[in-house]
Curated annotation (Swiss-Prot):
It comes from Streptococcus thermophilus (strain ATCC BAA-250 / LMG 18311). Pathway: Purine metabolism; GMP biosynthesis; GMP from XMP (L-Gln route): step 1/1. The active site is at residues 96, 186, 188. This is GMP synthase [glutamine-hydrolyzing]. PANTHER family: GMP SYNTHASE [GLUTAMINE-HYDROLYZING] (PTHR11922:SF2), GMP SYNTHASE-RELATED (PTHR11922). The keyword ATP-binding applies. InterPro entries: Class_I_gatase-like, GATASE, GMP_synth_C, GMP_synth_GATase, GMP_synthase, GMPS_ATP_PPase_dom, NAD/GMP_synthase, Rossmann-like_a/b/a_fold. CDD domains: GATase1_GMP_Synthase, GMP_synthase_C. It comes from the Bacteria.
Amino acid sequence: MQKERVIMTNISTLNDVQKIIVLDYGSQYNQLIARRIREFGVFSELKSHKITADEVRAINPIGIILSGGPNSVYAEDAFGIDEEIFELGIPILGICYGMQLLTHKLGGKVVPAGEAGNREYGQSTLRLRAQSELFAGTPEEQVVLMSHGDAVTEIPEGFHLVADSVDCPFAAMEDTKKNFYGIQFHPEVRHTVYGNDILKNFAFSICGAKGDWSMANFVDMQIAQIRETVGDRKVLLGLSGGVDSSVVGVLLQKAIGDQLTCIFVDHGLLRKGEGDQVMEMLGGKFGLNIIRVDASKRFLDLLAGVDDPEKKRKIIGNEFVHVFDDEASKLKGVDFLAQGTLYTDIIESGTETAQTIKSHHNVGGLPEDMQFELIEPLNTLFKDEVRALGTELGMPDEVVWRQPFPGPGLAIRIMGEITEEKLETVRESDAILREEIAKAGLDRDVWQYFTVNTGVRSVGVMGDGRTYDYTIAIRAITSIDGMTADFAKLPWEVLQKISVRIVNEVDHVNRIVYDITSKPPATVEWE
């Protein structure tokens, strides 16, 4: 019988913590709004647009932000809002679709896309037409990112115009008596030059935030909630060798001690020497109770002949839980499975309002007959926040700054069918890449880096002989939160050294290419 996910971060229980909630209307990047607010030291989290006024009262936020989204307020299936929320006396900021929704519900007028020729996509110059607390400290003209088809043509009673642009007569509006604000652009993205200032003004000047949220608060909150949720029952944690599951392990140990059993599944898709390193770091240094399971044959047999990336993820996710079932059957009274799911995993796997980019191993690969309830203590955090959490928990840099590693392991860094030969090329080339990046002192500057077996063979010459071997791609990116990323501009001499070493030291490889694609349009991983 399937059991439901346990939502570990329920901010309605944080009675002593100020929070600003963001209502989700479907933008793939609306969680960045919550992230920006958190950067100011104010707790924030995405909530469904279906939230009721009573639920908002229970959460007791100091502010509400209505996010952007792709819908029109005139669509039959348009996302709405419980209008009683407008009567709660809580400051509201509507962004893009959020501004249009605010206008539509409060008696203004929104013109559908194309009717007035007022579409705006890309950077635009915003012109302030009135003084506003929301724009305090920003210039009269500023560059913002617009992304809208529909537009406001009449603002509701009680509001006044704050800013416009060449193609948008009402780019910002406010009703200072009710503390309602609307902006047609996106302050959460870095293309809006003064976006952080605008969000900060809303949080502090308008909502009265104190900025006293910290990772220490998060640790205390999660430990308390884990203890309340788990009680005297037992938890299994799957260790993948990555940062996320390692941080979850230390957090759970602090919360419930020996009620935690960690299962480290060696699925045969790990990096070079990873299995022994996991046991030494987490079992030895931190004293976690770890059961190591060699299930490599089970996984590799199931993956034989499979080249579709989604099928790979599903197979690995399913088998991972089945291995857990097998191991859990040997233990008594285990009710929970803990995972290192991050906020970015949840968003990319699709929410109620946003489409799926790809299924994540911690989100979309679980079978319907799973026998555990899920505990996901990190599912409101971004990767850099997980590192900060690890530091707060006293974990050393060698663990906290370990390269991110997906649950499916090297399976999604091998294009096409997985073979032992391909696995070995990725293991060895990845080890060389990590070693040379560290030698160059770039391991803190480059957010993530790894190698990929592209599955492409090409002709080469080594010695006096012709070769026909694999092409290895190097992927290295810079990022802040993993939601957007640029390819890392690695020094040529470093790339050259990496390339020379790989083709000379790794069998069956004769060509190296460098991935210079940003995210978007690409994702970080190749599959």
